Amino acid sequence: MNTNKLHKQINLIGERAQAASQIVSGLSIDERNKILLSFASEIEKNSDKIVEINVQELKEHRDDLSLPMQKRLQLSKEKISTIASSLKALVKLADPLSEGNTSWQAKAGFKVVKKTVPLGVVAMIYEARPNVTIDAAALTIKSANAVILRGGKESIKTNQVLVSILQQSLKKLGYSENIVQLIEDTSHDSVKELLHLRKFIDVLIPRGSGSFINYVVDNSTVPVIETGAGNDHIFVDKSADQEEAIKVIVNSKIQNPSVCNSAEKLLVHADIAKEFLPKLFDRLSNEGVEIRGDKEVQLIDNRVELAKDFDWDTEYNDLIIAVHLVNNLKEAIDWIGKHTTHHTEAILTNSAENASEFMQRIDAAVVTENASTRFTDGFEFGFGAEIGISTQKLHARGPMGLTALTSYKYEIFGHGEIRK
């Protein structure tokens, strides 16, 4: 598309979203929930159509995508049913605008009210996973925001049909279809345009690879919530229950290897490595996991491919794990500090002292003791769905549910008071 034409088109989308945000911010919680129930109903009614288009799109891109990535793009009837159920579950959650509201009397006599409000216009730029289209639309509407969606080229046809269904639902209920909008241009230019649409967008949330998110953070003039990559580590302390550790590591790696809360790196205390690693590698190899490691790990088991320097900072999103030996807790903490993406870091140990030090010193959005990294998830935390997992410290951190899509304002109620 002509650059000038694209600029005008995306500015128009931004302008419409800003106007729509004023509409949705005035809707009651009952009205917002009614929209979500309509979404659920229409998605289920149109499931055959969605699956047909999704299957066709997957065939077009199959040769260019890894198997885990294909799974992320797939929308089966079962997945659609799960999405519809999650929308109905979201309806049951409390109104985020009703939370955190407080008031007090100021010394000068007037009343101050701290009131929770929506952010306004939320823009989502994401790669792959078309279920993000529904999650983002539902969470933003529940929290009384408008949303602009820009998905990847691999799922553009699926996203088009999903957004069309959502917009039809809005129109049937008498609301503006501009509450949910999709940017259909999947070129790099459309991303650049969005990054500079500060006049209309209140916050931008990118989801995708580490390099993609870094590009957005480095180049956006719109405020960004960084949903960083997950180069997640598990440290197996020498006191760990080895059978339990194997169970947790296998779950963390293989349950869904293409997501950001999948374990990518394993640190093992050298004192237990010779006993522990062959048993673990048996399980991982049986599950099709490629094992990489340093020379010390190779000497223990010849199934290990020698890791390169880049491995220690790579989020694989695949059935690959890299293993490194450490001599003590301090070495593990220092290693993680050097290679972390501040997403999820875990320790497996029976030492309360070591667990406490690890939990205290590790700088990550989620730090886990004796549990799978896969629990870093808004649904698992009880937030309902999530719009992303923030790895920054401002404005939100960790799994972002409804309250992460709100801010607050102060209202003053006076009786003619003046400042002296």
UniProtKB/Swiss-Prot annotation:
Statement: the UniProt record of this protein carries the keyword Cell wall biogenesis/degradation: no
Record PANTHER family: DELTA-1-PYRROLINE-5-CARBOXYLATE SYNTHASE, GLUTAMATE SEMIALDEHYDE DEHYDROGENASE
Pathway(s) the chain acts in: Amino-acid biosynthesis; L-proline biosynthesis; L-glutamate 5-semialdehyde from L-glutamate: step 2/2
Keyword terms: Amino-acid biosynthesis, Cytoplasm, NADP, Oxidoreductase, Proline biosynthesis
Name listed for the protein in its UniProt record: Gamma-glutamyl phosphate reductase
Subcellular location: Cytoplasm
GO BP, sorted A to Z: L-proline biosynthetic process
Gene: proA
GO molecular function term, any single one: NADP binding
Record organism: Oenococcus oeni (strain ATCC BAA-331 / PSU-1)
